[in-house]
Amino acid sequence: MANTLDVANNLEQALRESDEFKSLKEAYEAVMGEPTAKQMFENFRDTQLSLQEKQMQGIEITEEEVEKARQVVETVQQHEGISKLMEEEQRLNNLINEISQIITKPLEDLYGTAEQN
């Protein structure tokens, strides 16, 4: 077990040292260093978190909330720095998803996939 946790800690360090994480951190710091971009990004994140909380609690999201979220997304996508930040976040998420597929391979091999059953 300790060896597995050591490998996980090494993976965490490798993620921090990856080009994907470094690019994300650089883009994040650029946005946080610009007051207007920072405010726009924080508004975007607050809107996102609010909708996620409602979904998790089973609360219906109104058309007005959907429209507001759409407008917020549209606005932040027009900001070059925030758009870059979102692209870099997606690149890191892609890497993490690939790692997740590798990590869960033993379970997939054990239980098989839905297509095999």
Swiss-Prot record:
Signal peptide coordinates: none
Xref: InterPro entries: Com_YlbF, YheA/YmcA-like_dom_sf
Gene3D superfamilies cross-referenced by the UniProt entry: YheA/YmcA-like (1.20.1500.10)
Pfam families xrefs: Com_YlbF
HAMAP family in the record: UPF0342
Family affiliation: Belongs to the UPF0342 family.
Annotated protein name in UniProt: UPF0342 protein OB1136
Organism of origin: Oceanobacillus iheyensis (strain DSM 14371 / CIP 107618 / JCM 11309 / KCTC 3954 / HTE831)
Biological classification of the source: Bacteria, Bacillati, Bacillota, Bacilli, Bacillales
